[in-house]
Amino acid sequence: MKQLKSLFIGFVLAALASPVWAADSAGSITITSPANDAVLQSGAGNKLDFNVHLGPNGNHVHIYVDDQAPIVFRDVSHCPCSIDLPKLSSGKHTIVVKEATSSHAMTGVQGSVTATVK
């Protein structure tokens, strides 16, 4: 009976720890600049700074500014990463960085910010 109780406790501990192991193997994307709700200058000269930790299926990232075609960024092994954003018009913009597989399928790992251009 004591062995069975120890075995049960072992299973419970393993089950509780498994979400931690899953989180370690998942990728992550953090946008460091611009901050969420930042105010940017109109025109060119705005940068996007971000960190990427690819998940097991990740190969590169796609960067979206509003509904524009994605910017494919492959050199994520040396992050922190930085790119020049395309020229932005006045108004509110959403910037999303999404992890993609080698065949460009989205993995679900992403980071996003909203910024206003004055």
Language model regions located:
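Hydrophobic beta-strand segments within extracellular beta-sandwich modules
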Residues: 95-96
